[in-house]
Amino acid sequence: MFQELHKGSFNSNGRRRSFVKIYLINKKIEGAIPIMYDLYDFPLYRPPSEAYSLIIQITLGCSHNRCTFCSMYKDKKFIIKPIEDIKADIDAFRALYKNRPVEKIFLADGDALVVPTDILVQVLDYIKEVFPECKRVSIYGTAIAIHQKSVEDLKKLYEKGLTLVYLGVESGDDEALKFIKKGIKAEKVVELSKKIMSAGIDLSITLIAGLLGKYQDNKMHAINTAKIITDISPKYASILNLRLYEGTELYDLMQQGKYDYMEGIEVLKEMKLILSSMDVSKITRPIIFRANHASNYLNLKGNLPEDIPRLIKEIDYAIENEAINVNNYRFL
């Protein structure tokens, strides 16, 4: 999805919105469709795998918003949008797409799963009514949001059409989680992840290589991150590389000389340690593995555990030949 910002306005609730020209490129549609509308509150983020999905914002910002590495929603006050506004947005998107099929919908912003279950049910029901052709509805969630939902709540959401939750795990190491102010311990993350999957909902987790920098105990971060991946055994697991942005606590620590940022080859070595430390006997289901985000120094993809030897060989080759992606941008 390519976004071109034109100008700003205020909606009836006084919230800042942006007019955006978006070229929606769908494999099911020939060509690109230029559309002008003001349905999004920016910044707007989505997982890479949702590139061809319709994005519907049901929250703004992130309810946690304290992670020391994250710059995504620092300028946004967290709110849950009124159901009337959400339904109006869904109607507007239907009018824009007209008879073109919408098979995938992603619910944003950063912690949309925290929306009360009864409201989410209304959203999912309305999506089914307005976009009956939709085959997948996915959502960002936090551990806190999952904790607040009962298994019965999650099963109800699954029955209503919620098929995938994206969860930022970041690390399997308690010291690392404390360092980034994630607000949870690894054991609880595993428990909550299994809770999601027990309801029938697929889980996609993200981890971060280079999180602790050069001189922190990054070895335990890597080893315990390998452990949490195998302990959870989600359908999808992705490893991103840490990129620091102005306005985050980690960036400030780096500027003060209190944090030594890890880059390039050192990050690849940590990714190799994560993969080589996995106890494959604990993997209870095939895991679709990706490290192909714009932040990654090396694009990797495969299935765990079967492709671990090949993935390690690809990392070794990149290290030996210094064949890394030095792109410093993070497009989501």
Please describe what each predicted stretch is:
Residues I144, G172-A176, I196-H221, L240-E246, ...:
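Conserved strand-turn element in the central/C-terminal portion of the radical SAM core barrel
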Residues D41-A88:
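Canonical Radical SAM [4Fe-4S] cluster-binding loop centered on the CxxxCxxC motif
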Residues L54, I105, V137-I139, V165-L167, ...:
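Hydrophobic faces of well-ordered beta-strands that scaffold small-molecule active sites
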Residues D75, G110-A112, Y140-I144, E170-G172, ...:
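Active-site beta-loop-alpha junctions enriched in small/polar residues
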Residues A95-D202:
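Conserved SAM/AdoMet-binding glycine-rich loop
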